[in-house]
Amino acid sequence: MFQDNPLLAQLKQQLHSQTPRAEGVVKATEKGFGFLEVDAQKSYFIPPPQMKKVMHGDRIIAVIHSEKERESAEPEELVEPFLTRFVGKVQGKNDRLAIVPDHPLLKDAIPCRAARGLNHEFKEGDWAVAEMRRHPLKGDRSFYAELTQYITFGDDHFVPWWVTLARHNLEKEAPDGVATEMLDEGLVREDLTALDFVTIDSASTEDMDDALFAKALPDDKLQLIVAIADPTAWIAEGSKLDKAAKIRAFTNYLPGFNIPMLPRELSDDLCSLRANEVRPVLACRMTLSADGAIEDNIEFFAATIESKAKLVYDQVSDWLENTGDWQPESEAIAEQVRLLAQICQRRGEWRHNHALVFKDRPDYRFILGEKGEVLDIVAEPRRIANRIVEEAMIAANICAARVLRDKLGFGIYNVHMGFDPANADALAALLKTHGLHVDAEEVLTLDGFCKLRRELDAQPTGFLDSRIRRFQSFAEISTEPGPHFGLGLEAYATWTSPIRKYGDMINHRLLKAVIKGETATRPQDEITVQMAERRRLNRMAERDVGDWLYARFLKDKAGTDTRFAAEIVDISRGGMRVRLVDNGAIAFIPAPFLHAMRDELVCSQENGTVQIKGETVYKVTDVIDVTIAEVRMETRSIIARPVA
């Protein structure tokens, strides 16, 4: 009799509208209960039975109940699920399969089945890609997933690579395709095969994309020709190979191997500037004055060269530092190395005085065995030979940025605007507390930014530098010329790595249009979005594989007295993150390991300090000794403890 009663329906509607609700993100705990985090200040308790309806990370709307002064949340509506597509480990076999997502806070197995047409018989321990199909807040009885891709078996030594690439939906192999003949681009190529061009790379590098030639000029000037591999001589715009490169956007460099943007026949052979092989190049000829400034007579042109030597970073550095056994194979090559070192010094000084120079951080290299096991991790400091190449490339990219800006007004530019204007006052206030006075307006200009950076570099420690990093904006890829505050330059456009960066291929095509005096079409902004997204995914993949390998490498050190020097990189309420100086691994030190009495301990992310009883004991950038307390392989996390 009450079924269609309009009064009852109205009452229900009224009750519903009067019941308090909140939208937020579910945070799970290891104890079964959870919290609905509405914002940084407000969260509501979710009891264990209600947590069965949701998953960590779900964005939901919940009804808020108040009982005896205590508020709790009852999940009501799903706004956005945390899991859609994910990777995980399969449990069970045949008809009764479940998958445990590979995520530190998702421990529960989700019932699943293989998608139709997936011809793999899943078994315990297999890694798979899955997609969520059912959710309790969508009216389903339980969570349910569908296995859409088999990744590999549980004991595969290369799990870190295959699982990571599948997680980020990145390619596992080089693209297919061959380029059989060079295009007729209507370019006149200068024959520079007689010049003593050299390449300087790691011993294992196959995709050499830059060769250098230097010569002394009158009036203490130096000439530098930077010759860059020319894949756009083989790959037509809009062709199948071009489209594949556009999607990949970059070569993906992971520990142990890379997945190239172009087919290996091109990246490692046809386009690679191998010693004693004639190759087409796009080249830039520049004159450097005595103080290292690049003069205005910049010239871009097409050419053919023949590299006369494949030099190796460490050998060149040793020779310039008068150590080691290696000698250049001829006086002509020796003279090239000496001139290039001179150019490097001049350009380094010019950038130090007129732009900005990054502090040198070592590169960490994983040395892997046949089965992907980590034999060692070595820190490779940036030496003179690395700097020779770096200075030459930066100079060449400055030239391209100028030419594209002046001749076309567009290109693919790396733009970094320094500090976010919204943060300028807070930044000035923070610096003032440390005795540095800056004008909030001035610091938003390129000159003001450079001035501040130089003052920070002159500080005895990097502490203040680390405090202001959060006020900086991110570097972006733009079709519009703009400044690069991080480098201290008015404009910066890369073209020196076209084998491994699609944006550099675009700039090659634009520079060729300039050389031929033709009009060019402005690149579409969508391509910069794709490049930025791919760069983000590749970096995450590199980090994920690295975390896995670090965990493998340090597992046998857990619980031992082996000491590691570690730099504090971040402090949060829960503890400190540190980077092991010798190998680059990131480890976490939980707050209880810092001091047993929690009420005497203050870990402040805001100040970058840890205080015990009001005394600052640790701060970001401090280097301390730690031991490895535990390595959790399932989450690839390393827990460290300070040495007392």
Curated annotation (Swiss-Prot):
MF terms in GO: exoribonuclease II activity; RNA binding
Main subcellular location of this protein, as a coarse class: cytoplasm
Domain S1 motif stretches: 561-643
Keyword Nuclease belongs to the record: yes
InterPro entries in UniProt: CSD (IPR011129), NA-bd_OB-fold (IPR012340), RNase_B_OB_dom (IPR013223), RNase_II (IPR011804), RNase_II/R (IPR001900), RNase_II/R_CS (IPR022966), RNase_II/RNase_R (IPR004476), RNR_Ribonuclease (IPR050180)
EC number: 3.1.13.1
Pfam families: OB_RNB, RNB, S1
Keywords: Cytoplasm, Exonuclease, Hydrolase, Nuclease, RNA-binding
Subcellular location: Cytoplasm
Disulfide-bond pairs as recorded: none
Lineage top rank: taxon: Bacteria
A GO CC term assigned to this protein in UniProt: cytosol
Keyword Nucleotide-binding annotated: no
Stretches assigned to the RNB domain: 189-516
Catalytic activity: Exonucleolytic cleavage in the 3'- to 5'-direction to yield nucleoside 5'-phosphates
GO biological process, one term: mRNA catabolic process
Entries under HAMAP family matching the protein: RNase_II
Family: Belongs to the RNR ribonuclease family. RNase II subfamily.
Its biological purpose: Involved in mRNA degradation. Hydrolyzes single-stranded polyribonucleotides processively in the 3' to 5' direction.
NCBIfam families reported in the protein's UniProt record: 3_prime_RNase (TIGR00358), PRK05054.1 (NF003455), RNase_B (TIGR02062)
UniProt protein name: Exoribonuclease 2
